[in-house]
Amino acid sequence: MKKEVCSLAFLKAVFAEFLATLIFVFFGLASALKWPSALPTILQIALAFGLAIGTLAQALGPVSGGHINPAITLALLVGNQISLLRAVFYVVAQLVGAIAGAGILYGLAPGNARGNLAVNSLNNNTTPGQAVVVEMILTFQLALCIFSSTDSRRTSPVGSPALSIGLSVTLGHLVGIYFTGCSMNPARSFGPAVVMNRFSPSHWVFWVGPIVGAAVAAILYFYLLFPNSLSLSERVAVVKGTYESEEDWEEQREERKKTMELTAH
C-alpha cells in the first residue's frame, strides 16, 4: 500500500482526477449560467456535460482511469477493481477539484448570469424519495456503461469508450434535469454547494442516489454478469493495493531480463 502511494504514477493519477473534475465542473456549470441575452436550454446543458466528460475521459483516462466522479470510484472499490487507499485519494481529489472548478466559474461569471451556479435541487414537486430513485437509475446506467466500455476482458469491438460514456452522461441529463437538475456525481453537486454555501435539506440525495446506483451496477457487473476469477486472498490484495496480476509479473520479469542483459554487456 505504501509502495502504491509513493509511486509517481499514483501521484499523477490523483492530480489527473483533481484536474479532470475541475474542468468538468467548470464547463458543466458554465453551460447552465443564466445569461440575460440567452437562457440555457436542456439540450445545451446535457450536451455540455456529456461532451466535457467524454473529452476528459479521452484526455486523462489513460493517466488515472478517468473516474471524475466519487460514485464511480466507490463503485469500483465495491467491484474490487481498485485499492481502498486509491479510492480515498481519488474522492478527495475529485471533491477539491469540484470546489476549485465552481470557484473559478464564480469568479469569472458576472453576477447577473451567475444565479445559484446550477446548485442541484429538487424540481417540479419531486420528493426526496423520488429524487433518490431517479439519481440511482441515472447513475446505474452510467456506471454500467463505464464498466462495460472500459473492460479490458472484452473481446468484441467496443468502439470509443469516451464517446459511449459522454453519451451516457448526456442521456442522464436529458431526463434528470427535470427532476433534480441531474447530478449523477456527488462532486458535481458538492462543488457549487460549497462555493455558494447553499446546502439544502435534500443535499444528501445527490450523494446517496448516485453512490447506491453505481454500487448496485458494480455488484451486478463484477460479481454476477462478468465476475473475476480471483481468490479471496487476491481480492484482499486488490483492496490493500498489493495485488499484481500475471501481466504485471510478466512485465517485471521482462524488465529484469533486459536489465541483466545490459549489465552483462
Swiss-Prot record:
Topological domains, Cytoplasmic: 1-12, 61-65, 75-87, 148-158, 225-265
Gene this chain is encoded by: AQP5
Topology in membrane: Multi-pass membrane protein
Catalytic activity as recorded in UniProt: H2O(in) = H2O(out)
Keyword Transmembrane among record annotations: yes
The protein's assembly and partners: Homotetramer; each monomer provides an independent water pore. Interacts with TRPV4; the interaction is probably indirect and regulates TRPV4 activation by hypotonicity.
Compartments where located: Apical cell membrane; Cell membrane; Cytoplasmic vesicle membrane
NCBIfam families with a match to the protein in the record: MIP
Record: glycosylation sites: N124
Protein name as annotated: Aquaporin-5
GO cellular component terms, semicolon-separated: apical plasma membrane; basal plasma membrane; cytoplasmic vesicle membrane; endoplasmic reticulum; microvillus; plasma membrane
Function, as annotated: Aquaporins form homotetrameric transmembrane channels, with each monomer independently mediating water transport across the plasma membrane along its osmotic gradient. Plays an important role in fluid secretion in salivary glands. Required for TRPV4 activation by hypotonicity. Together with TRPV4, controls regulatory volume decrease in salivary epithelial cells. Seems to play a redundant role in water transport in the eye, lung and in sweat glands.
Gene Ontology MF, one: water channel activity
Family, similarity comment: Belongs to the MIP/aquaporin (TC 1.A.8) family.
GO-annotated biological processes: camera-type eye morphogenesis; carbon dioxide transport; cellular hypotonic response; odontogenesis; pancreatic juice secretion; protein homotetramerization; saliva secretion; water transport
This protein's UniProt keywords: Cell membrane, Cytoplasmic vesicle, Glycoprotein, Membrane, Repeat, Transmembrane, Transmembrane helix, Transport
Non-spanning membrane segments, not crossing the bilayer: 66-74, 181-191
Motif (NPA 1): 69-71
Main localization of the protein described in the UniProt heading: membrane
Coiled coil ranges: none
Entry domain remark: Aquaporins contain two tandem repeats each containing three membrane-spanning domains and a pore-forming loop with the signature motif Asn-Pro-Ala (NPA).
Residue positions of motif NPA 2: 185-187
Residue ranges crossing the lipid bilayer per the database entry: 13-33, 40-60, 88-108, 127-147, 159-179, 204-224
Tree of life domain: Eukaryota
Residues in the Extracellular compartment per record: 34-39, 109-126, 180, 192-203
Record Gene3D superfamilies: Glycerol uptake facilitator protein
